[in-house]
Amino acid sequence: MNIVPSKKLIDKLLYMEVDDNDFHQATLNIMYQEWQTNYIGYTYKEILDWFEDTYDSFAKFAVLIGKYNQQVCNGGHIQYFDNGYANGDGGCFYKHSSSIPLHNELIKLFEKTELKEDELSLKVLKILKKFEIEEEDDEILNYDYLRALDSEYYKLCNEFMELINDYIKHKIIGE
């Protein structure tokens, strides 16, 4: 069964009068604004759970894939891990679990979208599934592997983010 946006999310985005090219970023902004205004003490995982409970799994997927893209494009998969976005607890300088639970949830949600039928999306999904952290004594051991994974993603990320925004726009306004 595919995930779809809730009426509440659709209404919120339409009320915001979002520019056609910004549906994805607008979804991230909704969560970030709530986090900074009303839930400042929450961890990333806690605010994501609140966002999913308030809106839906579709909204959570939009945030997870957006933060993945932002973190990887800014500093690679190592930054994505080190800043806590693959794990959900704490931020930079915290100890994060190499079991990467939020990243695994991203993959599960991705597989519940129609994106799994698109060739470009399948390439990105393959990269997502290849992401893993090998560490010993808080040192990342698979640095070269992660840098190669970064390079793979960088070749696809701009086109993929356009696809994500178009996908979200289509789900919100049906165009």
Where does each model-flagged region fall?
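Extended, alpha-helix-rich binding/interface surfaces that flank or overlap catalytic cores
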Residues: 2-104, 108-175
